[in-house]
Amino acid sequence: MNKTIMALAIMMASFAANASVLPETPVPFKSGTGAIDNDTVYIGLGSAGTAWYKLDTQAKDKKWTALAAFPGGPREQATSAFIDGNLYVFGGIGKNSEGLTQVFNDVHKYNPKTNSWVKLMSHAPMGMAGHVTFVHNGKAYVTGGVNQNIFNGYFEDLNEAGKDSTAIDKINAHYFDKKAEDYFFNKFLLSFDPSTQQWSYAGESPWYGTAGAAVVNKGDKTWLINGEAKPGLRTDAVFELDFTGNNLKWNKLDPVSSPDGVAGGFAGISNDSLIFAGGAGFKGSRENYQNGKNYAHEGLKKSYSTDIHLWHNGKWDKSGELSQGRAYGVSLPWNNSLLIIGGETAGGKAVTDSVLISVKDNKVTVQN
């Protein structure tokens, strides 16, 4: 009898350890966006095209349900946030009416009650791609991202070049062979008020803008971790935005993922521990750049980090590893943990699984 009970206990523990965090996404999912509201997860765009899905994490039979398609066309690098029961989607990269790749600065709103989308008559004062979005006191805040004019111009040139490989090589060399400050990544902080649909200036980084940073916020503090300083060159910087009191303060924490940094990483909080995991970058690019090579990642292979770092006692500690390196998925707060949905692995392969990272007593637990 005791042996039978013990065997059942082992089987149940094994099943729990191997149980998937969430069901696989309906399609391999990367470069999209997502948000969570009342334990219901919403994901869409990126490699899912115009599709959006939701999943009730508290349901007994968890499954992804297709929602109304996004009306703005396929997008990558859009961001999203829930405010007062509605889902807002900001910008992204996609095709315009002429078929040219461009950065958008528009806003769409999804109403879960009616399963319907509407494009708002509101445009950010700059393009939104590679940016981050977070919510504070009922407003959405946006910072970072590529320069709309420079990025759009690059893709216009590529379109003109067609299949002319010589022209394409020349365009790429011209585009990548510049210093970081010459790309004018967005270092402004913008606020969006959903009640008025108006954009406002909310501040400005005393350092520089990034693209593809990881973002997480709790209470009056928001952290921006790593990202690109220019196309192909990452930064290991960590910025903290402190909304405590009447004046926004920008602080710089110790770097992480040094020396090269990563973009497309994942950030979250578990039991008050700040987590940073994964991301992709080019090892050796920082040294190349410091040695005067502006096209810093030329000839380098993109690598995907498995590292999990915790911010503890004023410094970053590597505290665990993902089962495989990944980047460019969605990271959300769930069950007092960091939930990662999808992403891409080596070679840019989009994946369908989810990962849950939890911290207790500064010890990391990873559930796949």
Swiss-Prot record:
Swiss-Prot/TrEMBL keywords: Carbohydrate metabolism, Isomerase, Kelch repeat, Periplasm, Repeat, Signal
Origin: domain of life: Bacteria
Residues annotated as catalytic: 228 (proton acceptor)
Its job: Converts alpha-N-acetylneuranimic acid (Neu5Ac) to the beta-anomer, accelerating the equilibrium between the alpha- and beta-anomers. Probably facilitates sialidase-negative bacteria to compete successfully for limited amounts of extracellular Neu5Ac, which is likely taken up in the beta-anomer. In addition, the rapid removal of sialic acid from solution might be advantageous to the bacterium to damp down host responses.
Assembly: Homodimer.
Family to which this protein belongs: Belongs to the NanM family.
Protein name: N-acetylneuraminate epimerase
